[in-house]
Amino acid sequence: MKHIFNKEQCQKATFILESPLAKLSELYSSEIKDLAVVWCYYSGRIEGNTYTYVETEALLKDGITSEKKYEDAKMLKNLYNTFISELEYIHQEKNKEIIDERTLFRLHQSISTGLVSNEESGFLRTRAVRISGTDYAPPKDLQEIKSKLGEILYEQDVYTNPLEKAVFLHCNIARLQPFIDGNKRTSRMIESVVMMNCLLYTSPS
């Protein structure tokens, strides 16, 4: 059995997994929508989205747009629609999402629609990208990206603790940068889907 967490972190993870307060089943429908709004606000904020929490709530619950960039509103709407869709599929319809390339590409397409070209939405990038604030350069060769992504998706199965699996996928997909844009949003969504699969309350990253 492989671990990311140290002994103390494993104990905390076990506490979370066993706590009834961490279960999605304990949330009402209205609370789930509130959770989605909070998740989308913080996920967008990490990306530099300029919407405040109040503006985000008005946009996602009431359809009221702020006088800000179209891309900011589109980012939040895409995140919200994807998050709610996954919650309904897993929580309400009692399904489990398989974390594979097909799911990853579908989630990226849902998150990036209208923000990148149709040819790049839901497809691996064929151009080099950079991560600001670091000297690390993600692989730029398509075959190398495919190979490393395959390794990540294969290796996830060595983690039996869903919280460790969520962290592993989040960090490694974000580092690989398999898409032209929206990599961190997609990795946070995958992280949340892993937790949803275990009917866990997914807090903002």
Label each residue range with its predicted role.
Residues M1-S203:
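FIC/Doc superfamily catalytic core
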